[in-house]
Structure formats: structure tokens, C-alpha cells
Amino acid sequence: MSMIDLAFIIQRPPYKSETSTLGLTHAISYQVVDMFLDDGQGVIPKVCFIGEGVFNCISEHKSMENYGVTSIESHVKNSLLVDLDMYVCKEDIDRFGIPENRLVDAEDMGADKKLQIVPFSEIQNILNNSKHIFIF
Amino acid sequence: MKLGVFVNEFKTVVETVDRLTAEKLGLIFIQNGVFHATIKENGKSSPLLDKTANFYVLAEDLATRGLTDADVDNRVKVVNYGDVVDLIFNDYEKIVWL
């Protein structure tokens, strides 16, 4: 089976623009892309939050209450629920003083996957091994 | 001049704000500007908070991003939309948006 690795890099903070949301919805769409591929082909998306993009991963968003829009937290949780591999740059959450226990977790929705906190070197490896890289 | 400045970005506005002077300066952190009031990069508060100014942060934009009053630097006052309207009409002669 021929699988293609895709890297989605989210580097913009949440909500002021649609950028972060677009990155996540594009990544989630991997579930339906099979219909456009030949038999035996598939894609493996990986989502990486770096820089100010790690702000998207702080939990307890109240965007529906305040903006009337689906929260980025919901998109992250749904991504975990469909078994997307998602990575958060450890250097960046440390730099911004974001404790790991403040990050989004989809365990309450029954997701097996969790946000994986990794050093940037691991994200660099993901970039190196991906056929296509999408920056949001 | 009494100048109120809406700060709605985290990284890109620091230099501009740093150059602004006014008889009375108010920095109102909204949208992604709220991270100036909450994030300590490498253990240090935003350099904007070192300015001589009054600082405000919009509660609704904090909550949207999963942040609470407890995350806010003690130099910054948490305000709601109604308070911001009062600031615009009562406290500042000119308002700019960065």
C-alpha cells in the first residue's frame, strides 16, 4: 500500500483569523480524500503546533459563548477522535509558560490519541519525512 | 492627547506601541492581544507592560482562548464590552487600532 505523509504546521494564534481552523479542517479532511486516490493509496496527516500556534492548544475555549463559532478546541478534540497524530512543540510551550495540564485533551470524548508534546527536533523529522508540508 | 490603543496581535505590534507617547495612554488588549496580559515568554512579561500606561484586557477574548482572570498580570485590569465602550467615550480622546 502506498501511503503519503502530509505535515500540517500550525503557527498562528487562534481566532483572529481563520488560519488555525483551516489547518485543522484540512487535516481532518484526510478521512474523505481516499475517494480521490487510486486503490492502495492513502495519506497520513500529522498536525504540528509550533510558535504562537501552541496557543490553540490551551483548553477550555469559550468561543461559542462569545463569538458564536465552533471552538478550535473542538476541532482539536475531533482531530484526536479520528486518530490524527498531533504534536505540540515542547520548547514553545515551555517558552510561553504553558503547563502541560492546560492543554486540550479529548479523553472525555473517548479519544485514544492525545496531543504529543515533543521537542522541535521531532517535528523537524516529521517535516523531513513528509512529501507535502502545509503551513497555516 | 489621551490616546487609547487597541492591541489585537501578540507579536507584530510591540515596536509600534513602544514608540507611541501620549499625555494619557491606555492599552486595551483584545483578540490575540490578550496574550500580552497573560503570557510570560521565557519567564518575562510582555515588554508592553513596562510602558507608562493604563492596561486593560477584554474578558470575553480571554475566555474564548481558555484563559481566566487568574492568568492576567496584576498590572492589567480585566474589562468587559460595556467597560470598553465607557473607555472609548469617557477616558480617551483618540482611539487607534493596531
Summary of predicted features, one role per range:
Chain A
Residues V33-D34, G51, I72:
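Trp/Phe/Arg-rich N-terminal binding region typifying the photolyase-homology
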Residues S63-I93:
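A glycine-rich helix N-cap at a beta->alpha junction
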Residues F55-K62, D105-G110:
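Short, basic, glycine/proline-bearing loop/turn elements
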Residues I44-G53, L84-D92:
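Short internal beta-strands
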